[in-house]
Amino acid sequence: MRRGERRVAGGSGSESPLLKGRRSTESEVYDDGTNTFFWRAHTLTVLFILTCALGYVTLLEETPQDTAYNTKRGIVASILVFLCFGVTQAKDGPFSRPHPAYWRFWLCVSVVYELFLIFILFQTVQDGRQFLKYVDPRLGVPLPERDYGGNCLIYDADNKTDPFHNIWDKLDGFVPAHFIGWYLKTLMIRDWWMCMIISVMFEFLEYSLEHQLPNFSECWWDHWIMDVLVCNGLGIYCGMKTLEWLSLKTYKWQGLWNIPTYKGKMKRIAFQFTPYSWVRFEWKPASSLHRWLAVCGIILVFLLAELNTFYLKFVLWMPPEHYLVLLRLVFFVNVGGVAMREIYDFMDELKPHRKLGQQAWLVAAITVTELLIVVKYDPHTLTLSLPFYISQCWTLGSILVLTWTVWRFFLRDITMRYKETRRQKQQSHQARAVNNRDGHPGPDDDLLGTGTAEEEGTTNDGVTAEEGTSAAS
């Protein structure tokens, strides 16, 4: 069976679900069990190709005398060997399409990225910034000052040629980036409420931290209309429609060579890039304290990862348009979906000894390491105190959340148990009163009556026995 598909294939032409213990949120999957060359591990093939490549470099290629070049090439070769090992030997995750090796590759990239972050963390601030020159010589230079915010008029009457120039100036490449980003985040989280909460809370964070990072300073309509309603809102809406289609889709798979028509073969190839099966996420944060804290933790990590994007660029002197910034976003898009599925399975697992998935573990470690780099490289910026009115707002919000948590999971349960006990007592008293009015003894009266009758019977028996003895004598 294919690696990464956690199901047992039925026989050829089988039309029964593959997983008997399927959850109610999981779709039914039908598979003919075809195992082709595409799905095999190819561990020996990869080892042979890797050995040939290393042998060619060692025996046939002349080693350059450039120390810096050799160092870079040695590091890249070491990473490639590790990726080859991981792609063929690492443990499969929950996803298997388009191929399990694809997700094993991103798992290994996560390890490499975390090791890179650890290396940067252990350098001095100056050495860490200058080390990035080995990646790109244009890095390691302080970022130029930029003007953010500016004129926030939607209609600028002073500009006769184009009074809406402020709006057109905001329509840059970040608009489609926001839309695509939130479309993909919705596919990861699979919940409208959580997506909207994260979207709105991040705008509040931008308001709160604009005294630390100048690029957080935006116009009000850029925050709430362009970002929340248009870009983020439209991306979330399209993502929810895609989730609806995926949850209703029939997951029935056949081997490519078992499909008779060319149109069917092309359709099968296209559907190779869709999920093998589908699980609808039901987070249910208010169902228990455990799930409530877990959902709050997920939202916190999401917001922290978003903030790290901006703070890392600031402390490591990376321009927003640099390709490393884009590569980091692509990385999180690929690993985020796997991590969310593993977290959901971890929360939904009924076993007493649960284990967090490997990709979720790495994503959490990466997010924390990025935060530590920001704290070490620019503590002055992070320690700039919040304005008083902003700190008051966050304090009030925290108190409200804490109060609701205590009421929902502690006081409410105690109150409900107390009311239920009172209700049962009242019903018992009412039933006893009704029985007494009807002339029937209540439960306690029955017990008392039985005890009296037994005592009387015992007394009468004793008297009868005494009388019988007297008569005999």
From Swiss-Prot:
The keyword Glycoprotein applies. It comes from the Eukaryota. Pathway: Phospholipid metabolism; phosphatidylserine biosynthesis. It catalyses: a 1,2-diacyl-sn-glycero-3-phosphoethanolamine + L-serine = a 1,2-diacyl-sn-glycero-3-phospho-L-serine + ethanolamine; 1-hexadecanoyl-2-(9Z-octadecenoyl)-sn-glycero-3-phosphoethanolamine + L-serine = 1-hexadecanoyl-2-(9Z-octadecenoyl)-sn-glycero-3-phospho-L-serine + ethanolamine; 1-hexadecanoyl-2-(4Z,7Z,10Z,13Z,16Z,19Z-docosahexaenoyl)-sn-glycero-3-phosphoethanolamine + L-serine = 1-hexadecanoyl-2-(4Z,7Z,10Z,13Z,16Z,19Z-docosahexaenoyl)-sn-glycero-3-phosphoserine + ethanolamine; 1-octadecanoyl-2-(5Z,8Z,11Z,14Z)-eicosatetraenoyl-sn-glycero-3-phosphoethanolamine + L-serine = 1-octadecanoyl-2-(5Z,8Z,11Z,14Z)-eicosatetraenoyl-sn-glycero-3-phosphoserine + ethanolamine. One of its GO terms (molecular function) is L-serine-phosphatidylethanolamine phosphatidyltransferase activity. Disruption phenotype: Null mice exhibit a reduction of more than 95% in serine exchange in testis and approximately 90% reduction in brain and liver. Testis weight is reduced and some animals are infertile. Elimination of either Pss1 or Pss2, but not both, is compatible with mouse viability. Mice can tolerate as little as 10% serine-exchange activity and are viable with small amounts of phosphatidylserine and phosphatidylethanolamine content. Highly expressed in testis. Detected at lower levels in kidney and heart. Almost complete inhibition by ethanolamine in both the mitochondria-associated membrane (MAM) and endoplasmic reticulum (ER) per se. GO terms for biological process: phosphatidylserine biosynthetic process. GO terms for cellular component: endoplasmic reticulum membrane; membrane. It is found in: Endoplasmic reticulum membrane; Membrane. Residues 1-40, 96-104, 313, 376-381 are cytoplasmic. Keywords: Endoplasmic reticulum, Glycoprotein, Lipid biosynthesis, Lipid metabolism, Membrane, Phospholipid biosynthesis, Phospholipid metabolism, Phosphoprotein, Transferase, Transmembrane, Transmembrane helix. The modification Phosphoserine is found at S12, S14, S16. It is an enzyme of class 2 (transferase). Its EC number is 2.7.8.29. Residues 1-25, 422-473 are annotated as: Disordered. Residues 62-74, 126-291, 335-354, 403-473 are lumenal. The chain crosses the membrane at residues 41-61, 75-95, 105-125, 292-312, 314-334, 355-375, 382-402. Catalyzes a base-exchange reaction in which the polar head group of phosphatidylethanolamine (PE) or phosphatidylcholine (PC) is replaced by L-serine. Catalyzes the conversion of phosphatatidylethanolamine and does not act on phosphatidylcholine. Can utilize both phosphatidylethanolamine (PE) plasmalogen and diacyl PE as substrate and the latter is six times better utilized, indicating the importance of an ester linkage at the sn-1 position. This is Phosphatidylserine synthase 2. It comes from Mus musculus (Mouse). The lineage of its organism: Eukaryota, Metazoa, Chordata, Craniata, Vertebrata. The gene is Ptdss2.
